[in-house]
Amino acid sequence: MRYGLSAQRSLINVCSRRFFGKDAKEQFLKNLSSIPASKHPRLVSDSDANSAMSVLIPLVTVDGRDSVLLTKRSIHLRSHRGEVCFPGGRMDPGETTTETALRETFEEIGVNAESVEIWGHLKSVIRRQADFNVTPIVGYISDERVLENLVVNSDEVQAVFTIPIDELIKKAGLTKFQSKRMKYTLPSFDSTEFKVHHNAPNEYLHSTQRVWGLSGVMLHQALTLLNPDVYKHDLIVKFF
């Protein structure tokens, strides 16, 4: 089930707002440093490459609008097929979380490390089954022309698109989950306003894209740190 956030948020005018201004990185790091560094008690060891992953949350200004880049996984994959996510994957032995995120981004969509300015690490996110954790790395792509020369791995990625941050904030909502063992609520984001930079030939791309699950949790973290004066919430997320 999906529930909208408070009416107060829906009344906030965030159109045409700039989020990646001159002091954006410094403010982001200041907000990040104010968060307690404690880890989720169920997180697996960061040194276990078999159960540790990292992703890049790429920030980029497209057509004058500050945006977040996402990918849609190929429908031909065995797991999480067709889901919207950030580029990333499992850590190789000896890699740092940043190195993994940048390597996977290059392998999936062809954006090289030199094009990304790393802003910082968010709290690792744990999967409900507690079998692996994912560290989100926030990075800024200063030149949007990078998106004109994507080299997409069609075995893994169907589409690459960007969603303006003001659109994400306006469309933010909550999704309630219930299983035999637990109930929980996670942030989710439905967008009808996005720019497609790549889509595989003959593959259908829906007019609404939903960011939810772990990707929604990671996006929620990033928006909280980027725009705490606009993206206001009282949701306690149990997965980081």
From Swiss-Prot:
GO terms for molecular function: coenzyme A diphosphatase activity; magnesium ion binding; manganese ion binding. Its EC number is 3.6.1.-. Its cofactor is Mn(2+); Mg(2+). Residues 50-190 form the Nudix hydrolase domain. It is an enzyme of class 3 (hydrolase). The keyword Hydrolase applies. The keyword Protein transport does not apply. A motif (Nudix box) lies at residues 89-110. PROSITE patterns: NUDIX (PS51462), NUDIX_BOX (PS00893), NUDIX_COA (PS01293). Mg(2+) binds at residues 104, 108. It comes from the Eukaryota. Keywords: Hydrolase, Magnesium, Manganese, Metal-binding. It holds the Pfam family NUDIX. Coiled coil: none annotated. GO terms for biological process: nucleoside diphosphate metabolic process. Probably mediates the hydrolysis of some nucleoside diphosphate derivatives. Belongs to the Nudix hydrolase family. PCD1 subfamily. This is Nudix hydrolase 3. The lineage of its organism: Eukaryota, Metazoa, Ecdysozoa, Nematoda, Chromadorea.
